[in-house]
Structures are given as C-alpha cells and as structure tokens.
C-alpha cells in the first residue's frame, strides 16, 4: 500500500504558479513555478521567471487582470495534472514556525492534499461588519459588480443563487489562491474569463486610476466561491502565509 501511494504521487504533476512582477526570493521546490506577470508590457525586464506572454495569453491586460494573467497563461499553455496560484507575498502552508519559508506547502503535502480533496484554498478572510457586496461598494465602483451579476443572470443563471448567497456573507476565500485538478481549472477558467471579458466590454478604463483599474482581479476573488459551490466541489482550507507586512490601509486591495 505504501509503495503504491508513493508510486501514484510520483506521477502526480503539480505546478503552483507564483505570480510576481519583480525580482524576489522564491521557493526552492520545483512544485513552484514563478511567473512574470505583465511581461508583454515590459519586454526589456527579464526576471528569469516563466513569462506570461508566451503562447496564447492576455499578458498585456495585466494592469486590469493582475495575477489572473498568470492563471490564463497556465490554462492555455501549461501541461500539469494539478495547478495552483499563489503570490510572491502570499503562499499556502500547513506548518507554523518563525521561518516562514520553512512553512510553505511542500510537494509531498500538496500531493497528499490533492489526493483527498477537489480544491485547496486559503483560510477564509473575514470582514465581520460588512458583507462582501457592501465591502466592494464602499471601496470600489459597485457598478462593476452589478454588471457581473447581470451577465451571470443572463448567461449563467444556474450560478445566480450562489452568487447572491456569497455576496451576503462577511467572509470569502480571497486573493485568487487555490490548487485544483487541471481539468477543474480548465472548467473554472472557461467560465470565469467568459464573464470577465463580457464585463470588460462594458467598462470605460480611460478615467480609472491604476489602483481601481485592477478590478478583474478583485471581481474574480468573489466568483471563486460561487463557482465551487454551484458545482458542489469539496475543498480543504489551509493557512495563508504572508511574507512581510500586509499594508492594511491599502488592502482594498492591490494585486500583483
């Protein structure tokens, strides 16, 4: 039994993308794949990471889609059994300790989790006094979320009940962080980007400051739970490990 488990894990190809726009320390394990996001906009900047502008991509949309340009690249170009997304400042992990780099999810831990659960997520982020909808309304342009809801109601009505329920909550699985089977990620990306591209056609970006322009990374944060719950996938929560100090006043929030 032990040898069979080891054998099956050996052939479980997991790639966890680490979205980054600048040079920074990276995990040493080959389960992690650093991805330079927005490479198309900075062709002379070579971080030595996988660029997000190879093959079919939306790299030039990074100012609006943030880390989603990495997951789009993986959806269209990466061959793996499981894929995940973390950030150069935020990782997933299961251990506690002073050295955060020693607490990051290992390949073996990721393999064990993926064998038992459909999707791996960071622990819920709680807002306590605000719902997800009201928090967005108070920090961003709520018309963007209203347009998203209208598109879901028209094109994906089976997702509307979960959308309405999720928006009432004071918590959610944020930061677009996950690990899931590639076939699930393919389903998710096809659904997610179809919605976001339709919202994009209804937005005038000319007057939006850079911080507010990153709206698709924020909208997608709220849609992940909608997709998971509508499809009935199981999930396992593990720790989110923050590298450095989070800038709370700005946590409206700025994506990579």
Locate the predicted segments by residue.
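ER/Golgi luminal nucleotide-sugar-dependent glycosyltransferases, focusing on the catalytic module
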Residues: 11-253
């Amino acid at each position: 039994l032990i040898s069979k488990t080891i054998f099956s894990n050996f052939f479980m190809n997991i790639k966890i993308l680490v979205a980054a726009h600048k040079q920074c320390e990276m995990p040493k394990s080959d389960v992690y794949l650093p991805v330079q996001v927005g490479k198309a906009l900075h062709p002379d900047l070579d971080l030595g990471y996988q660029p997000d502008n190879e093959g079919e991509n939306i790299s030039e949309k990074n100012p609006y889609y943030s880390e989603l340009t990495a997951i789009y690249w993986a959806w269209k170009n990466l061959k793996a059994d499981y894929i995940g997304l973390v950030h150069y400042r935020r990782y997933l992990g299961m251990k506690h300790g002073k050295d955060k780099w020693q607490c990051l999810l290992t390949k073996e831990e990721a393999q064990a989790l993926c064998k038992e659960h459909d999707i791996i997520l960071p622990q819920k982020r709680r807002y306590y006094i605000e719902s997800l909808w009201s928090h967005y309304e108070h920090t961003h342009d709520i018309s963007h979320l209203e347009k998203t809801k209208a598109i879901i109601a028209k094109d994906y009505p089976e997702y509307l009940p979960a959308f309405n329920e999720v928006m009432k909550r004071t918590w959610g699985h944020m930061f677009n962080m996950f690990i899931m089977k590639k076939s699930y990620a393919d389903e998710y990306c096809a659904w997610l980007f179809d919605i976001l591209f339709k919202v994009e056609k209804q937005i005038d970006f000319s007057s939006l400051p850079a911080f507010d322009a990153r709206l698709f990374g924020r909208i997608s944060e709220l849609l992940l739970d909608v997709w998971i719950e509508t499809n009935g996938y199981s999930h396992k929560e593990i720790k989110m490990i923050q590298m450095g100090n989070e800038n709370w006043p700005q946590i409206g929030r700025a994506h990579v």
